[in-house]
């Protein structure tokens, strides 16, 4: 689209070589220069916070020797997905520092982008599964048995990882490195074999990975909020509220954060599709979509490092688990000893 490097750093991996006859628009060089300077540092910051934060979350969930409840199973899988995702971000930071000249070879071009694409699906499907579980607990409590729900949660998580991996296969197959003589770089790009792939990709990206899950999330959380309002009088009589209410508050916050981070990305991805099929034209739209995709993409990336912060500041039960883990890992204080016994120990210690 633009005369800048034909690489849109998106988890949808929709970057392509521009057509030979594409109009070269260069109306925002200062903005691109700023992005090239700022984005690598921003990516590394996301990677650092996301790596430490999600490792911390996994340790809190997995170190105590006890069975995870259903919500914790889903949240642990979400943290694992975010952890795998942020491990690929340093490659993109180096790619931007290198003026979009991909230095890591064709295999890593495919693997890193495949991981990013899989994370997009795994994350949104896990958010749907979490919302559905809260819906069953609060709206249909009699129909949900804890043991059965735990088994279903494990199976659901396995299926989500498998489906996310399968949906990333086209990215793994179609991503490659290719020389771009006009820019004097070798870019990691997505090569779509036919124009029909543009439509198939936008259906996969905007409908399967966002609109359908969004409809499910809205349905489940609408009924969750209605159920919580119906229990408001009961919860007032309980000190601090029920355990289910605390867990639900955490999950609702995670859902809102996910939608805020990812909605702009899908909006600009749809605009990019409209530009590809020439439904919108002109240098204004080209620059607007190019820059918007870059910014929206990295707003989406922040979600992977934001979730651990939400656990700490919103998840009261999570903070309780952190404190319990701290006490478990901290050596217990020694029993007090008499002064005479202490004197005897010192004499034995200093004896030559």
From Swiss-Prot:
Q: Which GO terms describe its cellular component?
A: plasma membrane
Chain ranges sitting on the Extracellular side read 1-41, 94-110, 175-206, 272-294
- Cysteines engaged in disulfide bonds, as pairs: 109-188
Record-stated family:
Belongs to the G-protein coupled receptor 1 family. Bradykinin receptor subfamily. BDKRB1 sub-subfamily.
Q: Which SUPFAM superfamilies match?
A: Family A G protein-coupled receptor-like
InterPro entries linked:
Brdyknn_1_rcpt, Brdyknn_rcpt, CCR1-9-like, GPCR_Rhodpsn, GPCR_Rhodpsn_7TM
Predominant subcellular localization, coarse grouping: membrane
Q: Where in the cell is it found?
A: Cell membrane
Q: What is this protein called?
A: B1 bradykinin receptor
GO BP, sorted A to Z: G protein-coupled receptor signaling pathway; inflammatory response; response to mechanical stimulus
Q: Where is the lipid attached (S-palmitoyl cysteine)?
A: 329
Residues with glycosylation annotation: 13, 21, 184
Cytoplasmic topological domain ranges are 63-72, 132-153, 228-250, 316-352
Per its database record, what is this protein's job?
A: This is a receptor for bradykinin. Could be a factor in chronic pain and inflammation.
Membrane topology according to the record: Multi-pass membrane protein
Membrane spanning stretches: 42-62, 73-93, 111-131, 154-174, 207-227, 251-271, 295-315
Keyword terms: Cell membrane, Disulfide bond, G-protein coupled receptor, Glycoprotein, Lipoprotein, Membrane, Palmitate, Receptor, Transducer, Transmembrane, Transmembrane helix
Q: PROSITE patterns given for it?
A: G_PROTEIN_RECEP_F1_2
